[in-house]
Structure formats: structure tokens, C-alpha cells
């Protein structure tokens, strides 16, 4: 069985109720390719609201969570809370969490482990900076990030989607070519095959997340090892529907 295409729209810290209503109406209007799993990453304060208005063919994700079920962690939310409002997904290890908020591989792994134990599905993000790419360290960096996740994931790979986001291609005006993206996805699969198992390598879905737009989505979708996208800014716009449908 082929890997089901999966497109995530990460709204980041954007949207008020009016804008969210517009985005959701656009998703309802679609039409969205029924062979694609669609997930939107929503600011924590709007998770419950979006859950009540989103169409059945779109899943909702939190954009972050902490590594404990409850406690004295002011400003954080737990997987238990996310599940309690009917949400089944969380995005963890996003490059903005790593760079702006200083989250290290080990913390991301602890969060992933706790989210999976709590029954959430996880979009786990990895990716290198411009400096790392220009010093030829792309594979070294993404393999290091992936290695940290392996013990956290254990045997729960069916609840994981990996997202490769070249940090250097986000908001910098530089974009990864489909071939550059495919090369990294292929290398990740080879690493998984060698270090986890052939079956995980074949089955796990790897999204691409580096300035995906309606203009470049089709060509990226045609790459053998790209199984979907994690879309940022474009997920707030009507063109998100085109990106979801890029694999048709």
C-alpha cells in the first residue's frame, strides 16, 4: 500500500475568529482531494473553537505541548488537555520552537515521547539552517535530530509524520529545489532503513516544509520520497486548497 499523502497547514501565531471562519469556509468549499489527509495547526486558544466548525475531512493539531500531563508549568499545555478538547494531533520540534525558543533535540524527543504515550499523533519536525547547509552539514544535522527521536518514538511509528523543513528556505527568499528536497527525503529514508527498519522506512510519511506555495507544490508532490507538505503562510490563504490537491 502506498503512503497516504498528508498536508498540514501550520497557522502559527495567526488568525482571529473572523479570519479563522474565512479559512474554514474555504476548506469546506474545497473541494479537497479525498485521498489526502489534511491537518491544520491551530493556536492553542482556538483549538476548541476550530474543532466545532471544521469539516469532518480536516483534522486539527496543536502547535506545541509540554512533556508532562499537568503541573506547575505556567503558559504550557499538555497532551491530556489537547485530547480533552477532542484534538488528536500535535506539531513538535518546529524550527521556530528550536531557534526562537531554544528547544534542543533532547527536549523535543521528551515531548514527542510523552505526546505519543498520551495517545496523540505527532508531526515531528527536523531541518538544517542556512549556515549548516552551506557548511555541508545537512545530513549530519537531520540525522542527529532524527536519531534523538528514534528512542522517543519506540514502536509508535504509525502515529508519526516526519516533516523536513530546511530552515534556510523559510522566509529567506531562498528556496529548495524539488531535487534538493527529494535528496534529503531519500537520505532520511535510507537512514531509517539502516537504523530503524526497512518497514518503517517504507511506511513513514515525510512531509516537506520550506516555503511551499501553490506554484511549487505540484512539482514537489511528484518527488518519490515526498509524502506531503507542512505549509506555513500559504495555509492562511485560499491557495491552501490547491496545495492539498497538488498530488492529483
Curated annotation (Swiss-Prot):
PROSITE patterns: TIM_1, TIM_2. It comes from the Eukaryota. It catalyses: D-glyceraldehyde 3-phosphate = dihydroxyacetone phosphate. Pfam families: TIM. Coiled coil: none annotated. Substrate binds at residue 12. Transmembrane segments: none annotated. Pathway: Carbohydrate biosynthesis; gluconeogenesis; Carbohydrate degradation; glycolysis; D-glyceraldehyde 3-phosphate from glycerone phosphate: step 1/1. One of its GO terms (molecular function) is triose-phosphate isomerase activity. It is an enzyme of class 5 (isomerase). Keywords: Gluconeogenesis, Glycolysis, Isomerase. GO terms for biological process: gluconeogenesis; glyceraldehyde-3-phosphate biosynthetic process; glycerol catabolic process; glycolytic process. GO terms for cellular component: cytosol. Its EC number is 5.3.1.1. InterPro entries: Aldolase_TIM (IPR013785), TIM_sf (IPR035990), TrioseP_Isoase_bac/euk (IPR022896), Triosephosphate_isomerase (IPR000652), Triosephosphate_isomerase_AS (IPR020861). Belongs to the triosephosphate isomerase family. NCBIfam families: tim (TIGR00419). Homodimer. This is Triosephosphate isomerase. It comes from Bombyx mori (Silk moth).
